A protein has these predicted regions:
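Hydrophobic/aromatic residues positioned on beta-strands within the core alpha/beta folds
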Residues: 91-93
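Alpha4 helix (beta4-alpha4-beta5 surface) of REC/receiver domains from two-component response regulators
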Residues: 74, 95-112, 121, 125
């Protein structure tokens, strides 16, 4: 008799950054959080393809802003269009136009933000908060009002 794998508790967290050292650093730091599987990507287009195949398994996407092929804000917008419950964090070392950024936060496309460099303790704290928010949103779909 074959062994069945339970995937119902599989909660994926994507890290999307074209700088491989950043995605590896974040992956290693977030391994400490129980109940999630970290999936690093260095190409936002590949991240989007993977996300679209198993969108309901993703609970959080952390993305850099400036990347070749597809910027982080557009990537997160496409992901939110596909799965409204997924939580998103944008990070950048650059300035972002206030009107564009406020539009994305107002429409809940971006749930969290980091200015690089990111302290690992801040990253872990924010990820835990976003995971908690995800669980609340899935349990109470009208939250927040």
């Amino acid at each position: 008799m074959g062994r069945k794998r339970l995937v119902t508790n599989r909660r994926l967290v994507a890290i999307v950054d074209d700088e491989e050292d950043i995605s590896v650093l974040f992956r290693d730091a977030l391994k400490r959080i129980e109940g999630i599987t970290i999936v690093p990507f260095n190409d936002p287009r590949i991240a989007l393809e993977h996300f679209e195949k198993i969108k309901d398994a993703y609970v959080l996407v952390i993305s850099d802003f400036r990347m070749p092929g597809l910027n982080g804000m557009e990537l997160l917008r496409k992901m939110k269009d596909t799965n409204k419950y997924v939580r998103t964090i944008l990070m950048t070392a650059y300035e972002i136009g206030d009107s564009i950024f406020s539009d994305y936060t107002k429409n809940e496309i971006i749930n969290g933000f980091f200015q690089k460099p990111v302290r690992i303790t801040d990253l872990i704290k924010e990820v835990n908060m976003q995971l908690h928010s995800y669980e609340i949103q899935k349990t109470f779909p009208s939250y927040p009002p």
